Amino acid sequence: MQSTGAPGLAQSAVLQLSAMGERSRELGGALREPERKRRLLLVVVCVALLLDNMLYMVIVPIIPDYLADLRGERGNSSADLDIQIGVLFASKALLQLLVNPLSGTFIDRVGYDLPLLIGLLVMFLSTCIFAFAENYGTLFAARSLQGLGSAFADTSGIAMIADKFTEEAERSRALGIALAFISFGSLVAPPFGGILYEFAGKRVPFIVLACVCLADGVLLLTVVKPFSDRTRENMPVGTPIHRLMVDPYIAVVAGALTVCNIPLAFLEPTIANWMESTMDASKWQMGLVWLPAFLPHVLGVYITVRLAARYPERQWFYGALGMVIIGASSCTVPACKTFGELVFPLCGICFGIALVDTALLPTLAFLVDVRHVSVYGSVYAIADISYSVAYAMGPVVAGQIVHNLGFVQLNLGMGLVNVLYAPALLLLRPVCQIKPSFSERNVLLEEGPSGLYDSIRLEERALRRKGLSAGAGTEHGLRGRSEEEEESGPESA
């Protein structure tokens, strides 16, 4: 009986191993499907952006109290504490601002996968250091290290979305989803950090974020091969970042991204003290004042994506309208006397920012497509620089303006700058007018693949557009390169 049972057990084990191998091959094949792979990469990028913004904001309710305890031990003054908090908040954006030109060039040369993995690993290390930091110097190092990780993860993530989703409507939709995750991370992090800090201690919020970051990195490794030489061999030569910076259309978009984020960046470090002195706000009110703004932000993203799908030539108008809404809302903030009243202008600011970001981030990729080479690392490094300028100045400059001029003057100035900048987006109108014809032309192209990820897109295009002829009109006058350069970049799906 034992002699006949052993072969049966062995055969059963072989069959089970064979079935497991078959399931693994099926899973690997499913992950290699272009559409599914593209969606998984969108999930990876959105989680990375969520983590970065949660880590940026989760320290808001934790660090002041933690540094106050350290101050009690060392006898530092309250003024020194305010300076330490301001420098700590600004250090991330400052380092991100310095590293972005280098990270953008690096992304253009090696692709999007490896820089995203590097960014996630650095963010994981930064989060772990935050969890176990015991002094201000270590906290400062962790905060600065987060800026280094963000320069790689944020830029490569947004650039990867632009590269994978090349049709204008789906690109706007994918970038809109990413922006919703950014907003959710920024707004939910303070209550998340405050609750866990209150009931579980300082380390727990950071350990949770570190675990999610590690899981996101593992998911990225299952979807792509960041160390593959094939990707780097197929990379077209991108336009240098200094040439993109002097492009007038890209400069207008970068300026708008900076200006529209100034109210949010300047109000975050100043509004709590103003609420306490003006309306005697409680701690929970100061902690939750931004949370209701999440819904208007998501609504703004949704509306802009739907409008961009139907009227892509009006992207400049959506951005200009958003800046006017931001300006008007910023001017009304000082007039609020209660917590309920204050929620409305803050919602207006976030709604306007959603309009501007959702309209202009896809426009940056489109500008690179029609005027340069379709490689997006450097152009989205410029976008990240624009955000970093606002958030680097916020914690340092806003407090000085409030101290010297007053909170009312700060808000009126921010509102006026946004309203005055809005007409500058009229300069984008000629470029936005060609969006429908350019999108149609790219959809009908049938040349062979030559750029990054073009093979995947060619397969998708053959499946979706089978039987269509390649005879659309041309837009040579608006392209800043020859036909060979034009087709070397990623093509539309």
From Swiss-Prot:
| Species classification | Eukaryota, Metazoa, Chordata, Craniata, Vertebrata
Primary location class: membrane
Any single Pfam family the record assigns to this protein: MFS_1
Give the species this sequence originates from. Danio rerio
What GO CC terms are in its UniProt record?
AP-1 adaptor complex; AP-2 adaptor complex; terminal bouton
Name of the protein: Probable vesicular acetylcholine transporter-B
Q: Which domain of life is it from?
A: Eukaryota
Q: Which residues are glycosylated?
A: N76
The UniProt keywords, alphabetically, are: Glycoprotein, Membrane, Neurotransmitter transport, Transmembrane, Transmembrane helix, Transport
